Amino acid sequence: MTEANRILLGVNVDHVATLRQARGTRYPDPVKAALDAEEAGADGITVHLREDRRHIQERDVLMMKDALQTRMNFEMGVTEAMLAFAEQLRPEHVCLVPETRQELTTEGGLDVAGQEARIREAVERLRGCGAEVSLFIDADPRQIEAAARVGAPAIELHTGRYADAHSVAERACELARIRDGVEVGLSHGLIVNAGHGLHYHNAEAIAAIRGVNELNIGHAIVAHALFVGFKQAVKEMKHLILSAAARG
């Protein structure tokens, strides 16, 4: 948990691997990107090992586990194969996410309320191997309360609908929903993180919400890095969210 008026930045390097996999090459290396992100001020590195292995591969995860100086936030679907892999990997942080093969990116939050027994079992197994578990969920009080019931110490609120809002009014509505979700999470003693679809023009409002511990941001940083370099892109995002949190 961060101190008041401070916020952490988790840098997701999945889309460095997306660029590599597009041509089946050995470059660019997401492990190098992760190390550069740490050097530039990232507080942690997020990677999502998807069932279809469309970007990050097992080798990337294993190398990062050994090389990172901060911490790995390992995103995974709730499947037996991924649970078994995580039990061997023993990452410091695990975030359980919903996953379907057809989606371009994670399209919604995990339905914890609709499958409490299954999620509770996964949380218990992961905590048993030393991981702090978070659940990637919508800013819905019903889902947040379910997350607390299954024993997850942390949640990551899905900011996708806020990021994709088509009008000022819609965005304000989604921002209010996230703000309320943060309050509900804190009232249940949860660590509250946020992410999905955040970029250099919309992350500040989320960073300014009191009680948000960390933002996980990837695609926007990778895209901006094409023009300014990876380290600079991370530095700019870190400065942006820290400034917003201080003002908030």
Curated annotation (Swiss-Prot):
Where does the protein end up?
Cytoplasm
Record pathway: Cofactor biosynthesis; pyridoxine 5'-phosphate biosynthesis; pyridoxine 5'-phosphate from D-erythrose 4-phosphate: step 5/5
Q: Entry's SUPFAM superfamilies?
A: Pyridoxine 5'-phosphate synthase
Q: What is its main location?
A: cytoplasm
Gene3D superfamilies per record: Aldolase class I (3.20.20.70)
Which keywords does UniProt give here? Answer: Cytoplasm, Pyridoxine biosynthesis, Transferase
Pfam short name (any one) = PdxJ
Record: active site = H48 (proton acceptor), E75 (proton acceptor), H196 (proton donor)
Q: Residue numbers for the site described as Transition state stabilizer?
A: E156
Tell me which EC number(s) this protein carries: 2.6.99.2
Keyword Transmembrane helix tagged: no
Concerning InterPro entries, the annotation shows: Aldolase_TIM, PyrdxlP_synth_PdxJ, Pyridoxine-5'_phos_synth
GO BP annotations listed: pyridoxine biosynthetic process
- Which residues constitute the signal peptide according to the record? none
Give binding positions for 1-deoxy-D-xylulose 5-phosphate.
D14, H15, R50, H55, T105
- Catalytic activity line of the entry: 3-amino-2-oxopropyl phosphate + 1-deoxy-D-xylulose 5-phosphate = pyridoxine 5'-phosphate + phosphate + 2 H2O + H(+)
Q: Where does 3-amino-2-oxopropyl phosphate bind?
A: N12, R23, G197, G218, H219
Question: According to its record, what are the GO cellular component terms?
Answer: cytosol
Q: Partners and quaternary state? A: Homooctamer; tetramer of dimers.
Q: What's this chain's function?
A: Catalyzes the complicated ring closure reaction between the two acyclic compounds 1-deoxy-D-xylulose-5-phosphate (DXP) and 3-amino-2-oxopropyl phosphate (1-amino-acetone-3-phosphate or AAP) to form pyridoxine 5'-phosphate (PNP) and inorganic phosphate.
Q: Which family does it belong to?
A: Belongs to the PNP synthase family.
| Record protein name field | Pyridoxine 5'-phosphate synthase
This chain is encoded by the gene named pdxJ
